């Protein structure tokens, strides 16, 4: 079989360490009864361990050369190799709307977008595991007060328990990336509803972290406007990285109340 050359524009760094691949494959075992979707399998170094598990496995790959390689290397997967862009797919059609585990050695250039896609489909993705850039993994797992705590941390931790599992050297890839990688696992928590307007919650989180050096009283103004009244809650004197998920929910409710008050008074 003709080997696939990694394509820079697709952010491809092919994993070549079988022990690391096995360890990543084993992270899906938290939900042994669910099917698995692997994103960006490349030449199947992770796939080979996933297919050995007694469960349905599908892979989605945007690179036509990798798809051709996979079809030849894994004939038993023929009907489950999907040539498509994961970010544009309707995930509810994959397993007839049933839940599945998401995994992969994710391309660095779209890892954040993949996790936003996961959040959009959290009703059918109870678990997401895989390898990403170490810096992004640390950001997702970070808690309040950390310099790496940010938009991804809050939005993901609102719905998922995050585990930073292990760090991976850059030398186990072809070509080696310039940074280290890490494997994480995100498992849905018990939250059914946030207790606030979800769309406004996202807006509040993104707006405040985009001006993270400002106090919330100032960074929230793009949403509220200059003349919108705020309560004297001490929460507004904090910076976004100081707030827990629960405090962001409280903040969102206060912002919504302030918007209603402003609308009612004609501001």
Swiss-Prot record:
GO terms for biological process: rRNA methylation. Its EC number is 2.1.1.182. It holds the Pfam family RrnaAD. GO terms for molecular function: 16S rRNA (adenine(1518)-N(6)/adenine(1519)-N(6))-dimethyltransferase activity; RNA binding; rRNA (adenine-N6,N6-)-dimethyltransferase activity. The keyword Amino-acid biosynthesis does not apply. The keyword Methyltransferase applies. It is an enzyme of class 2 (transferase). Specifically dimethylates two adjacent adenosines (A1518 and A1519) in the loop of a conserved hairpin near the 3'-end of 16S rRNA in the 30S particle. May play a critical role in biogenesis of 30S subunits. NCBIfam families: ksgA. This is Ribosomal RNA small subunit methyltransferase A. It comes from Bacteroides thetaiotaomicron (strain ATCC 29148 / DSM 2079 / JCM 5827 / CCUG 10774 / NCTC 10582 / VPI-5482 / E50).
């Amino acid at each position: 079989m003709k080997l696939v050359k990694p394509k820079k524009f697709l952010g491809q760094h092919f994993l070549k360490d079988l022990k690391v691949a096995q360890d990543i494959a084993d992270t899906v075992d938290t939900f042994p009864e669910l099917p698995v979707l692997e994103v960006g399998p490349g030449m199947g170094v992770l796939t080979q361990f996933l297919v050995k598990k007694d469960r349905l496995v599908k892979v989605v790959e945007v690179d036509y050369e990798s798809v051709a390689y996979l079809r030849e290397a894994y004939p038993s997967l023929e009907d489950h190799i999907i040539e498509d862009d994961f970010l544009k797919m309707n995930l509810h059609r994959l397993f007839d709307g049933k839940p599945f585990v998401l995994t992969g050695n994710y391309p660095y250039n779209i890892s954040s977008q993949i996790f936003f896609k996961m959040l959009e489909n959290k009703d059918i993705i109870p678990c997401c595991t895989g390898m990403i850039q170490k810096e992004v993994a640390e950001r997702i797992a970070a808690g309040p007060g950390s310099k790496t705590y940010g938009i991804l941390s809050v939005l993901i931790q609102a719905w998922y328990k995050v585990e930073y599992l292990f760090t991976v050297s850059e030398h186990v890839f072809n070509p080696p990336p310039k940074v280290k990688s890490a494997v994480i696992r995100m498992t849905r928590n018990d939250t059914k509803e946030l207790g606030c307007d979800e769309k406004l919650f996202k807006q509040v989180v993104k707006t405040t972290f985009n001006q993270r050096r400002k106090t919330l009283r100032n960074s929230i103004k793009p949403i509220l406007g200059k003349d919108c009244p705020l309560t004297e809650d001490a929460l507004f004197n904090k910076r976004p990285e100081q707030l827990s998920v629960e405090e962001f929910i409280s903040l969102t409710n206060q912002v919504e109340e302030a918007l209603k008050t402003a609308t009612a008074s004609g501001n």
